[in-house]
């Protein structure tokens, strides 16, 4: 989504999911050469921190799995973690996994670049238009009804993110995802922070952070108890909007971030982003053809890894339908 954090990691829990993200990285590295549009790609690498013995066992498995999946990864100690991100504190950190080929992008620029590539290859993109319903007859989907008329097609792909569930519900197709508030903050310039610092994830605290081009820090996180938003139906007028900041709900990730990066203690935050995103029960995205329905394909519910998976998911979905 346009308000995503823009972190692009390759390693996932299976070879097939990792293959999807690896293709995304290759695409993002080269797409600007074709379009002459910058997407802000920066192969800064990523770092996963471990703060417990149990986490380090899991990270050892992660490093071994990366090797099997063809992803460059190195298990490093606490001091080397600090070398990768000198501004943070390594207190309580036992070690981590360093993934040098990961990176970050600017989501809005990436979307514009992908759209240009699509148009250059004959795709028509209609903006300022809404899909009122999916057209179906005798279990065969043959297009969509929009507020500007019908669009008929051999295949209809639901890739509407958090809107996907309600589109499916209207024709009896269950797409198990729902909107959840997802928060991150962007700090003012922090001394010592540069654009080339790696993206960092600390799963024990459920936080992530990355540097900004202007020397700020983007800090986000997840909660054990999520905050759903408009589960039944999303308002028709909600588009390219953010929700109100919720500092109380973000208290735990913010405190964890300030402990890890002490300079944030006395720092002002210039932006609070509260953007709803789609999440699924098993934390895996939905990709495939719903049973009992022809001509329909679903690609949605990316659980905050939409930017990292978009390139590969689009590639393999198109090959599936070819």
Q: Where are the predicted features?
A:
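Glycine-rich FAD pyrophosphate-binding loop
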Residues: 1-2
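Dinucleotide-binding Rossmann-like beta1-alpha1 core, especially the glycine-rich loop
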Residues: 6-84, 206-209, 214-216, 244
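Flavin-dependent oxidoreductases
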Residues: 9-11, 15, 134-245, 252-265
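Short Gly/Ser/Thr- and Asp/Glu-enriched loop/turn motifs at secondary-structure junctions
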Residues: 42-46, 180-181, 272
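General beta-strand structural signal in soluble alpha/beta enzymes
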Residues: 74-77, 125-127, 146, 158, ...
């Amino acid at each position: 989504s346009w308000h995503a954090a823009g972190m692009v990691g390759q390693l996932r829990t299976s070879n097939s999911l990792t293959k999807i993200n690896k293709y995304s990285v290759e695409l993002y590295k080269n797409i600007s050469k074709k379009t002459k549009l910058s997407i802000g790609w920066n192969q800064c690498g990523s770092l996963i921190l471990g703060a417990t013995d149990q986490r380090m066992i899991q990270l050892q498995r992660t490093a071994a799995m990366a090797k099997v999946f063809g992803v460059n990864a190195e298990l490093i100690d606490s001091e080397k973690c600090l070398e990768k991100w000198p501004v943070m504190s390594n207190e309580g950190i036992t070690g981590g996994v360093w993934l040098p080929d990961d990176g970050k992008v600017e989501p809005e620029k990436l979307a514009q670049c992908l759209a240009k590539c699509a148009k250059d290859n004959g795709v028509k993109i209609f903006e300022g238009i809404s899909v009122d319903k999916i057209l179906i007859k005798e279990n065969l989907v043959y297009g969509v009804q929009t507020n500007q008329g019908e669009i008929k097609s051999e295949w209809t792909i639901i890739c509407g993110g958090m809107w996907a569930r309600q589109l499916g519900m209207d024709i009896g197709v269950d797409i198990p995802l729902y909107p959840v508030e997802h928060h991150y903050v962007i700090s003012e310039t922090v001394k010592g922070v540069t654009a080339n610092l790696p993206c960092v994830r600390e799963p024990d605290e459920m936080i992530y952070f990355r540097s900004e081009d202007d020397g700020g820090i983007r800090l986000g996180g997840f909660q054990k108890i999520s905050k759903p938003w408009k589960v039944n139906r999303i308002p028709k007028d909600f588009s390219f909007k953010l929700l109100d900041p919720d500092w109380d709900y973000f208290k735990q990730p913010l405190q964890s971030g300030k402990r890890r990066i002490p300079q944030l203690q006395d720092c002002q935050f210039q932006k609070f982003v509260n953007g709803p995103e789609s999440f699924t029960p098993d934390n895996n995205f939905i990709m495939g053809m719903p049973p009992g329905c022809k001509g329909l394909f679903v690609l949605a519910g990316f659980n905050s890894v939409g930017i990292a998976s978009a390139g590969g998911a689009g590639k393999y979905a198109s090959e599936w339908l070819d």
